[in-house]
């Protein structure tokens, strides 16, 4: 028993529950379950070192009988998302419904901008596609391709698109699903991982917004080395504060700048004379409105 208590192992934090962490081990010691409920070493708190879902960790003081251990060290992260907090993400999948709630270009763009800010690979998933006619869906896909995305279409009701989606996510070690609540993230995960049976909720009729059924971040296995994170839904992500950062978050604007960069270093690409960016693209009005919104938020108030 003493030898077991001194044993160590490595793994990944797959869930946070109150003051405990669930760690899935890479290789479980003999007689030990593959997933352990863990506390943190006090020295981690003293060093100000937080532990998040997705972190690679070393655990010690393993108690196989109780399925318990202590997180002793956190390995360096190669990426970190702040909202929701997830470490070591390699792909961000923005999930948007085509109906119930209706597709909202402004809201869709805000989620895509938030995803682009991570600097990670971003893909777009369209859910509830059975609620649109084939022609209407084709028009929407063509529109989004003009934004610089090649969306994957999915319907849990019709059972279509799941194989292509599973194959796409299996190529990333850790994917995060994000998007407004009520767009079908939990239904999508139930299709990807049939054993989960995550709780789903209807969309409220008046606001066309979903009730939040996911309350915490948790990782689920998609294969031997791939995991996907279900995250709490949120309805209105924030814009970046830096106006220079805003422009590069639009793939269609980046595409214009790629062959011929604008000759003005601090240009905001608003039709200035000599600017290398055309204003003739669908989301230009949204880009301009976002710049105005940023300006109003950064302007100091006149109140006391």
Curated annotation (Swiss-Prot):
HAMAP family cross-referenced by the UniProt entry: GTPase_RsgA
Family membership noted in the UniProt record: Belongs to the TRAFAC class YlqF/YawG GTPase family. RsgA subfamily.
Subcellular location: Cytoplasm
Cofactor: Zn(2+)
Residues annotated for Zn(2+) binding in this entry: 262, 267, 269, 275
InterPro entries: G_CP_dom (IPR030378), NA-bd_OB-fold (IPR012340), P-loop_NTPase (IPR027417), Ribosome_biogen_GTPase_RsgA (IPR004881), RsgA_GTPase_dom (IPR010914)
Keywords, in A-Z order: Cytoplasm, GTP-binding, Hydrolase, Metal-binding, Nucleotide-binding, Ribosome biogenesis, RNA-binding, rRNA-binding, Zinc
Keyword Hydrolase: yes
S-S bonds: none
GO function terms (MF aspect): GTP binding; GTPase activity; metal ion binding; rRNA binding
EC number, as in UniProt: 3.6.1.-
Domain CP-type G intervals: 78-237
Major enzyme class: hydrolase
UniProt-listed CDD domains: YjeQ_EngC
Name of the molecule in the record: Small ribosomal subunit biogenesis GTPase RsgA
Chain's gene name: rsgA
Top-level division of the source organism's lineage: Bacteria
Subcellular location, principal: cytoplasm
GO-annotated biological processes: ribosomal small subunit biogenesis
Subunit structure as annotated in this protein's UniProt entry: Monomer. Associates with 30S ribosomal subunit, binds 16S rRNA.
Annotated function: One of several proteins that assist in the late maturation steps of the functional core of the 30S ribosomal subunit. Helps release RbfA from mature subunits. May play a role in the assembly of ribosomal proteins into the subunit. Circularly permuted GTPase that catalyzes slow GTP hydrolysis, GTPase activity is stimulated by the 30S ribosomal subunit.
Keyword Nucleotide-binding recorded: yes
Cofactor binding note of this UniProt entry: Binds 1 zinc ion per subunit.
GO annotation, cellular component aspect: cytoplasm
UniProt: GTP binding residues: 127-130, 179-187
């Amino acid at each position: 028993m003493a030898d077991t208590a001194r044993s160590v192992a490595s793994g990944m934090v797959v869930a946070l529950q109150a003051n405990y962490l669930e760690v899935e081990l890479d290789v479980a010691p003999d007689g030990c379950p593959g997933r352990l409920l863990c506390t943190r070493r006090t020295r981690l708190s003293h060093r100000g070192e937080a532990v998040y879902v997705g972190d690679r960790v070393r655990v010690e003081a393993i108690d196989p009988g109780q399925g318990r251990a202590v997180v002793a060290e956190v390995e360096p992260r190669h990426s970190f998302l702040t909202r929701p907090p997830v470490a070591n993400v390699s792909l961000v999948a923005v999930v948007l419904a085509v109906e119930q709630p209706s597709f909202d270009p402004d809201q869709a763009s805000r989620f895509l901008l938030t995803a682009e800010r991570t600097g990670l690979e971003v893909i777009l998933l369209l859910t509830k596609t059975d609620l649109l006619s084939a022609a209407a869906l084709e028009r929407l896909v063509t529109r989004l391709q003009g934004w610089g995305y090649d969306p994957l279409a999915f319907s849990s009701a019709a059972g279509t698109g799941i194989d292509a989606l599973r194959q796409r996510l299996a190529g990333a070690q850790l994917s995060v699903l994000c998007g407004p609540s009520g767009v079908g993230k939990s239904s999508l995960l139930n299709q990807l991982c049939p054993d989960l049976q995550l709780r789903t909720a209807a969309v409220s009729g008046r606001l066309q917004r979903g009730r939040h059924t996911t309350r915490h971040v948790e990782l689920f296995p998609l294969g031997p080395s791939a995991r996907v994170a279900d995250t709490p839904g949120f309805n209105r992500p924030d814009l970046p504060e830096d106006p220079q950062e805003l422009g590069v978050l639009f793939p269609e604007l980046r595409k214009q700048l790629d062959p011929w960069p604008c000759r003005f270093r601090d240009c905001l690409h608003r039709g200035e004379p000599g600017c290398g960016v055309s204003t003739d693209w669908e989301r230009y009005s949204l880009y301009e409105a976002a710049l105005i919104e940023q300006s109003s938020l950064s302007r100091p108030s006149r109140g006391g």
